């Protein structure tokens, strides 16, 4: 962004995109010819020789400055989305990852994170995993599949029922403890895929959930990066 003395916008590059902005400035005429600023009349001696070559004694003719491009400003919500995409892309690349993996529940948060990941590093590098339990509705499972089809990400289904049952056969858990066990089975699954294939696990929680602790430690809170960690649910 380049702003003039009168606060007018002289040039603005596209936001959150690689590019180069060049601005020609219509500057006032230079001062009368004289010694460079800071130069004195003292004579200096040194063990080197300076040769000056004059290519032309004619002054360069002035030219009309070319107007710089002023890219339109992204609306607030679009700006937040672009910032989140850029942040995820930079984090993945600068930490040496080639791909990401996340759980797809059929809900809005995981759908948004999956879309952000596809825009950031390409759908071919995004792995979405549906991990249904005996309590999962057909609607949530079909929504996860449809999201994968629409975005083009790599999709797999890993039922967690047998994992949960193995725990419950050995530990008596009910109510909230059993519900959290399902979330933790999903977390273990994602971390296992990460260790096996080198994916970065993305957590899908948003700022509102993290602020009030609405998540399961070692469960849906698992992950190396949470794209929505600074995005409130209300946005």
Protein language model regions, located:
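ATP-dependent adenylation/pyrophosphate-handling site
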Residues: 98-104, 108-145
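Short acidic-aromatic active-site loops that bind/stabilize oxyanions
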Residues: 70-82, 176-183
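Residue-level signal for inorganic ion chemistry
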Residues: 107, 148, 202
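A conserved beta-strand->alpha-helix junction
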Residues: 20-22, 49-65, 125-130, 134-175, ...
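C-terminal beta-strand edge segments of enzyme domains
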Residues: 1-76
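Phosphate/ATP-binding catalytic cores across multiple sugar-kinase/actin-like superfamilies
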Residues: 79-101, 187-193
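Conserved helix-loop functional segments at active or binding sites
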Residues: 89-98, 119, 123-126, 166-169, ...
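Active-site adenylate/phosphate-handling loop in enzymes that bind or generate adenylated species
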Residues: 151, 172-235
């Amino acid at each position: 962004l380049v702003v003039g003395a009168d606060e007018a916008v002289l040039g603005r590059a596209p936001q959150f995109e690689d590019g180069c902005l060049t601005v020609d400035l219509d500057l006032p005429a230079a001062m009368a010819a004289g010694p460079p600023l800071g130069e004195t009349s003292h004579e200096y001696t040194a063990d080197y020789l300076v040769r000056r070559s004059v290519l032309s004694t004619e002054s360069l003719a002035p030219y009309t400055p070319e107007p710089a491009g002023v890219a339109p400003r992204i609306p607030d919500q679009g700006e937040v989305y672009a910032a989140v995409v850029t942040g995820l892309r930079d984090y993945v690349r600068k930490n040496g990852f080639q791909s990401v993996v996340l759980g797809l529940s059929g809900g809005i948060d995981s759908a948004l994170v999956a879309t952000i990941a596809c825009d950031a590093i390409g759908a071919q590098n995004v792995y979405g995993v549906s991990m249904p339990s005996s309590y999962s509705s057909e609607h949530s499972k079909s929504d996860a599949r449809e999201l994968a089809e629409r975005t083009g990400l790599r999709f797999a289904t890993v039922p967690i029922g047998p994992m949960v049952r193995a725990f419950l056969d050995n530990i008596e858990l009910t109510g909230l403890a059993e519900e959290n066990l399902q979330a933790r089975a999903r977390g273990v699954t994602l971390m296992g895929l990460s260790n096996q294939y080198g994916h970065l696990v993305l957590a899908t929680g948003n700022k509102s959930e993290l602020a009030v602790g609405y998540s399961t430690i070692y469960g849906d809170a698992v992950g190396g990066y949470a794209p929505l960690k600074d995005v409130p649910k209300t946005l």
